[in-house]
């Protein structure tokens, strides 16, 4: 197996810098669109053969160092007993969670019974790849999932979830606790199915002040990370707009902290220290730069991150209009310049 990513997550030496891309299996790939044109998104997530097929597509086309299982962070939420509608315009909960009664109605599902198709997709992905690269399992963080559930979908202001947290903190903690009780076995199921590393996405964590994040989110993330690390796999935590939260993310005990593009890698390293690996952090829209400029951005990030304990990635998901050839150019540039970085020959 190409184990660069796993070695980097553990801050062990690698021959070059490993790279994968958030949302690397997605609408920017014509082969993905060919499959997606015949099946609804949620149905695709629940079809192990097709989910495995689209998981493998970017590994084949781009040469990335890992496959992240094709799924959605809201899959385990649906298994808790709430109606979920997923389409190209984003998620929608027609019956949002707003009261104690709503929270009490939510179950803590058996992961195999409620989401076993995710485990099966991981097994089929490993077989299709012949274990050539590791498979990344993932889940959303309790706050991000709760934000969707309470708001009823995406939000720009997060008024409803924040009001719940600030006006009825005991209810918010009850919801976060129930989500954590669901997510830990869900991720352990993915590890048992063959995921070699897992990522926890707190996509909307940057909506909270560091003070509120420490109070409402860190206790649950610490518990998740601790229980997952006990399985022996490395754990990545990532959120958008969280440059001022890095020390908090480090406190979770995660092996890797993902950075978005708003903070240079070397500055993130200073906050995190030498005992945590980093992931990131190219702006997804830099894939629209001319190739020479994109190449320069790759070099700069590699130089700032250093040769060990760095997984190259975007600062958030790859965007649908992205040219797949630009993504392939990026992967090849990371690998090429990663070697030069280790040889001391990385130019300007």
From Swiss-Prot:
Pfam family, one: URO-D
Chain positions recorded as substrate binding sites: 23-27, 72, 148, 203, 316
Site (Transition state stabilizer): 72
Any one GO MF annotation of this record: uroporphyrinogen decarboxylase activity
Reactions accelerated catalytically: uroporphyrinogen III + 4 H(+) = coproporphyrinogen III + 4 CO2
PROSITE patterns in the record: UROD_1, UROD_2
SUPFAM superfamilies found in the cross-reference section: UROD/MetE-like (SSF51726)
Biological or metabolic pathway of the protein: Porphyrin-containing compound metabolism; protoporphyrin-IX biosynthesis; coproporphyrinogen-III from 5-aminolevulinate: step 4/4
Subcellular location: Cytoplasm
InterPro entries per the UniProt record, alphabetical: UROD/MetE-like_sf, Uroporphyrinogen_deCO2ase_HemE, Uroporphyrinogen_deCOase
This enzyme's EC code(s): 4.1.1.37
Gene Ontology CC annotations of this record: cytosol
Alphabetized CDD domains for the sequence: URO-D
GO biological process: protoporphyrinogen IX biosynthetic process
Keywords: Cytoplasm, Decarboxylase, Lyase, Porphyrin biosynthesis
Function, as annotated: Catalyzes the decarboxylation of four acetate groups of uroporphyrinogen-III to yield coproporphyrinogen-III.
Oligomeric form and interacting partners: Homodimer.
Similarity field: Belongs to the uroporphyrinogen decarboxylase family.
Protein name (Swiss-Prot/TrEMBL): Uroporphyrinogen decarboxylase
Chain's gene name: hemE
């Amino acid at each position: 197996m190409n184990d660069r990513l796993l070695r980097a997550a553990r801050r062990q030496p690698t021959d070059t810098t490993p790279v994968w891309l958030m949302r690397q299996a997605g609408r920017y790939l014509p082969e993905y669109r060919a499959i997606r044109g015949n099946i609804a998104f949620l149905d695709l997530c629940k079809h192990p053969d097709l989910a495995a097929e689209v998981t493998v597509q970017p590994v084949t086309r781009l040469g990335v160092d890992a496959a992240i299982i094709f799924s959605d962070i809201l899959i385990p939420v649906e298994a808790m007993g709430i109606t979920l509608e997923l389409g190209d315009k984003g998620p929608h909960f027609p019956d949002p969670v707003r009261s104690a009664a709503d929270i009490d109605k939510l179950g803590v599902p058996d992961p195999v019974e409620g989401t076993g198709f995710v485990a099966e997709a991981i097994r089929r992905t490993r077989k299709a790849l012949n274990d050539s690269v590791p498979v990344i399992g993932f889940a959303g963080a309790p706050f991000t999932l709760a934000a969707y559930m309470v708001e009823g979908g995406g939000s720009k202001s997060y008024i409803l979830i924040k009001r719940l947290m600030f006006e009825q903190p005991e209810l918010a903690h009850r919801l976060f606790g129930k989500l954590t009780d669901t997510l830990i076995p869900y991720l352990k199921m993915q590890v048992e199915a063959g995921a070699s590393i897992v990522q926890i996405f707190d996509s909307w964590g940057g909506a909270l002040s560091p003070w509120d994040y420490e109070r409402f989110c860190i206790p649950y993330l610490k518990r998740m990370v601790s229980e997952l690390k006990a399985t022996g796999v490395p754990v990545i935590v990532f959120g958008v707009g969280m440059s001022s939260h890095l020390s908090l993310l480090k406190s979770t005990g995660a092996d890797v902290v993902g950075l978005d593009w708003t903070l240079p890698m070397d500055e993130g390293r200073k906050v995190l220290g030498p005992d945590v690996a980093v992931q990131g952090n190219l702006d997804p829209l830099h894939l629209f730069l001319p190739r020479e400029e994109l190449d320069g951005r790759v070099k700069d990030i590699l130089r700032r991150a250093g040769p060990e304990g760095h997984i190259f990635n975007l600062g958030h998901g790859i965007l649908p209009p992205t040219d797949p050839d630009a993504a392939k150019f990026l992967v090849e540039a990371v690998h090429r310049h990663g070697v030069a970085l280790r040889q001391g020959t990385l130019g300007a």
